[in-house]
Design a protein with these regions (language model features):
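Conserved ATP-binding/catalytic segment of the ANL
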Residues: 404-471, 488
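Conserved AMP-binding/adenylate-forming core of the ANL superfamily
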Residues: 24-71, 75-79, 96-101, 154-163, ...
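Conserved structural elements of the adenylate-forming
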Residues: 47-48, 180, 199-220, 338
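Conserved AMP-binding A3 loop
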Residues: 36-40, 184-210
Length: 602
């Protein structure tokens, strides 16, 4: 396989090829207007950033941090840092003061780049507690800088330190010295058990990952890739860099809450997403079907059935559809299914990689049935995203996570653990020798902590090994499987399954309050607060009955028998969620110990 150019110079190589073609579409902070930046302009800004970093005293292998939501400045900073051999460390925009203080001190960060007021305020408050930290550089010009803060500098003013490229000869020399073995990023994992470790990623890992993914993921310079997930997340970072490296036009969505509007305004052809996004799409479409006329419901259900037979039964298995089915699909696609995709802004869709959690089979079938090419995959921060994914040249199975990408050796070890070896796998965790010894087998395979199996070359996951529950009857429960089925329901927003050393499975449920409140009003349920709503027997009965319908495919011992409705969301602030919005089970179980015990009272 052909290797790609080093990340330190990739922006400039692409500018030579694509010139004034748009590289990025984005919105400035506080603006509702989409703007474009060409490859040439981006290359120039990256050079300015590299020069500015040297002028402010940065030296090769120094650490910088980026504490921001997605924005153009984020990418300028990253690639500017790569150009002068700095290590860029991304922080989630939602990270707490305690988290960023720990990461800054652990990695000995010198400069921190922040997005908006919230991130600046947190960085300013912990500045004195971080002895290596010298500068806070602010992306959003409207941020109010604290009085007497000599460390703060707006990004516009930071770039002025690089105007005219005064240190470009030194930058060019650093390009020549760039090595694939150099450290590129440290990504701190927000583990579901609370521990945070810095995953070391080198330029060589990126080179291997981009090369392998380009061989199996159908993205090209004809695509428009929407950046939806935080670029701090390795899945989004990997897919953004892949899209950029092949010359795709990248659309930067800054506010995740505006993603639906952004999609309708910009019509992307590609976007990486997590299963929860598609669950929400599925629920919204079903809600519209339910409110339609009987004739419209019948037509749509027929279209979905045709779409399922064409896209799932035939295309997914690489079977040729019959002439009649092909003609029937062409008709329903043109008259009905395309309208669904258009309403989502996905009528020009190419591929939509999906990973980060288990995809409910019902949701995966639905997405394919409406003609959206969901590419399900599996990966970790430690593997620089993709380990495996569905491929266009091979049959795929609903519920699987695809085939290993080129260069990745996957085998199943003790306890059915998925083990990995290959050029994209991290060399280890930053300053964590003990953790590094535990992370690898004696023969050099990385321990993923995920249980799974391989069938006909395709990888299937069971659950996180540490999450597997054993009931008091000796039966094993995979909570993510149960939760993924329950989350399909429109009345349920969050769920935490309980089963370990218990007689049966129960669940803590956070309702989708808007819809449950509407249902309650329609059915004469009186309530004055969310606490009243969650305590109401009629509401509890309705939700439990819906759960029983959803979990019919599960074995009897896997099925949820009792539920407790929680009147507020699991949150980052309470420590119940990681920055990637995964449930921290030990914290949730501790916070709701009383409610859990009540479910098991005789």
């Amino acid at each position: 396989m052909q290797t790609r150019c080093h990340l330190s110079v990739i922006a400039h190589k692409l500018a030579e090829k694509y010139g004034e073609r748009p590289a990025f579409t984005y919105k400035s902070f506080g603006s509702s207007v989409w703007k474009k930046t060409s490859y040439n302009r981006f290359s120039q800004l990256v050079k300015q950033a590299s020069n500015a970093l040297l002028n402010l005293g940065a030296k090769p292998h120094d650490k910088i941090a980026v504490f921001s939501q997605n924005c153009l400045q984020y990418l300028i900073t990253d690639f500017g840092a790569y150009g002068v051999k700095l290590v860029s460390i991304p922080f989630y925009a939602t990270a707490s003061e305690q988290q960023i203080q720990y990461m800054i001190n652990d990695a000995q960060v010198r400069f921190i780049f922040v997005g908006e007021q919230e991130q600046y305020d947190k960085a300013h408050r912990i500045f004195a507690l971080c002895h290596t930290l010298e500068r806070i550089i602010i992306f959003d010009r409207s941020v109010r800088i604290s009085t007497h803060d000599p460390a703060a500098l707006y990004f516009d003013d930071f770039l002025k330190h690089g105007e005219g490229l005064p240190r470009q000869s030194e930058v060019e020399q650093l390009y020549n010295e760039a090595s694939m073995d150099d450290l590129c990023n440290i990504l701190y994992t927000s583990g579901t058990t609370g521990d945070s470790k810095g995953v070391m990623l080198t330029y060589g890992q990126y080179d291997a990952a981009l090369t392998a993914n380009a061989a199996v993921v159908d993205v090209s310079d004809k695509d428009r890739t929407m950046q939806f997930l935080p670029v701090t997340h390795i899945f989004e970072r990997g897919f953004t860099y892949l899209s950029f490296s092949v010359g795709a036009h990248i659309i930067i969505n800054t506010d995740p809450h505006e993603i639906q509007q952004s999609m309708r305004e910009t019509h992307p052809t590609c976007m990486s997403a997590v299963p929860r996004f598609w669950e929400k799409v599925y629920q919204a479409v079903l809600e519209k079907i339910e409110s339609a006329s009987p004739l419209q419901r019948k037509l749509f259900r027929h279209a979905l059935e045709v779409g399922r037979r064409y896209n799932v039964d035939c295309k997914s298995r690489r079977k040729c559809p019959s002439p009649w089915l092909a003609m029937e699909y062409k008709l329903v696609d043109k008259t009905i299914l395309r309208l669904v995709r258009k309403q989502l802004g996905l009528e020009n869709g190419n591929i939509f990689p999906t990973a980060g959690a288990r995809v409910a089979p019902e949701v995966e079938r639905f997405v394919h049935s409406v003609g959206i090419n969901m590419v399900v995959g599996y990966g970790l921060t430690e593997s620089l995203a993709t380990v495996s994914c569905d491929r266009s040249d091979k049959p795929y199975t609903i519920g699987g996570v695809g085939y290993p990408i080129p260069g990745i050796d996957v085998k199943i070890g003790d306890n059915d653990e998925v083990l990995l070896k290959g050029p994209t796998i991290t060399k280890g965790y930053y300053h964590r020798d003990a953790a590094n010894k535990e992370a690898f087998t004696e023969d050099g395979y990385f321990r993923t902590g995920d249980a799974g199996y391989i069938k006909d070359g395709e990888l299937f996951l069971t659950d996180r090994i540490k999450d597997l529950f054993k009931t008091s009857n000796g039966k094993y429960i995979a909570p993510q499987l149960v939760e993924s089925l329950i989350l399909v329901d429109k009345y349920i927003d969050q769920v935490a399954v309980v089963a370990n050393e218990r007689k049966f499975v129960s669940a803590l449920i956070v309702p989708e309050f808007r819809l449950v409140e509407e249902w309650a009003k329609e059915h004469g349920v009186e309530f004055s607060s969310r606490e009243d709503l969650c305590a109401n027997p009629k509401v509890n009965k309705m939700i439990l009955e819906r759960i029983k319908t959803l979990q019919q495919q599960l074995a009897h011992y896997e099925q949820v028998k009792r539920i407790t409705l929680i009147p507020h969301h699991f949150s980052l602030e309470s420590g119940e969620l990681t920055n990637t919005l995964k449930i921290r089970r030990p914290v949730v179980y501790k916070n709701y110990k009383q409610e859990i015990e009540k479910m098991y009272e005789e």
